[in-house]
């Protein structure tokens, strides 16, 4: 029997990794134990070129909607590396597209605060978005392409 490593935080996903989206199937299908609706406070959502960016904003009133994804223990380490690659997250590099940070996410079924990994816009991207980005409400799934196609981001080896 595999036991859970207490350092293995769940992931909070709010864009193309959500259930029903292409990157969910490519990266998460069969590798998770649970996927539960959640909300992330203190952030706002910007529409990117086919995928969203969450940006921290103290006092933000509308939470970002997404799912808390708990990876299977045997899949965790590899999944963490793959998600960092997908999100172009390079620890310590301010030019990274996203940064992976620990945040409290509200699990909707019981209102519990759950510590999770969240990919937020990196510093350079955040600055650009705040200057001229298009802010959207907190649920990216309501902002699909006009022709109804899912907005997706190519994963590693699919660019």
Q: PLM ranges: what are they?
A:
Residues 2-159:
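Glycine-aromatic micro-motifs
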């Amino acid at each position: 029997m595999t036991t859970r490593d207490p350092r293995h935080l769940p992931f909070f996903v709010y864009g193309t990794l959500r259930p029903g989206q292409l990157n969910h199937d490519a990266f998460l299908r069969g590798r998770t134990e649970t996927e539960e609706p959640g909300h992330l406070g203190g952030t706002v959502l910007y529409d990117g070129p086919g995928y969203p960016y969450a940006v921290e904003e103290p006092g933000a009133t509308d939470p970002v909607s997404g799912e808390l994804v708990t990876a299977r223990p045997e899949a965790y380490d590899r999944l963490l590396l793959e998600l960092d690659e997908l999100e172009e997250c390079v620890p310590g590099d301010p030019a990274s597209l996203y940064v992976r940070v620990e945040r409290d996410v509200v699990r909707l079924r019981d209102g519990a605060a759950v510590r999770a990994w969240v990919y937020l816009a990196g510093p350079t991207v955040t600055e650009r978005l705040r200057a001229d980005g298009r802010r959207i409400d907190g649920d990216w799934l309501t902002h699909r392409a006009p022709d109804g196609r899912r907005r997706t981001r190519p994963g590693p080896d699919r660019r």
